[in-house]
Amino acid sequence: SLYAPSAVVLSIGKGDASGPVTVLRATTLSCAPVPGGTHPAPEAACAELKAGFAGGGFGGLLASPDPDRACPQHFDPVTVTLDGVWEGARTSWQHTFSNACVMGTTLDGGEAF
């Protein structure tokens, strides 16, 4: 094979990563050799993951929340996960947000999740 495989499952779930998380949505995404899977925007999502991958994790996907967008202060946790193979190596990444609004501002309207 001439390329390192990149194929992941992306999910959004209700709950905190320290407890039970109920999966609300999950998609598959393959980025090599060509973008595909069940993800609705595979090309954009692959580009976003490639740009957000650093130091063995995907923390680069997290932006500073938009200071002009106010989110309610209620705690209704949402957890995003990424599991699979990225550039030929097994990977697993997750992040919990205090609520869906905070998730939206921190992921900055990205395509991956």
UniProtKB/Swiss-Prot annotation:
Give its localization. Answer: Secreted
| Annotated site residues (Reactive bond) in this chain | 73-74
What is the superkingdom listed in this entry's lineage?
Bacteria
Disulfide-bonded cysteines: 31-46, 71-101
| One Gene Ontology molecular-function label | serine-type endopeptidase inhibitor activity
Q: What is its main location?
A: secreted
Q: May I have one GO cellular component term?
A: extracellular region
Keywords of this entry:
Disulfide bond, Protease inhibitor, Secreted, Serine protease inhibitor
Question: Is this entry keyworded Cytoplasm?
Answer: no
Keyword Zinc listed? The answer is no
HAMAP family xref list: SSI
Subunit structure of this entry? Homodimer.
- Record's function text: Inhibitor of subtilisin BPN'.
Question: Which family, according to UniProt?
Answer: Belongs to the protease inhibitor I16 (SSI) family.
In Swiss-Prot or TrEMBL terms, this protein is called Subtilisin inhibitor-like protein 15
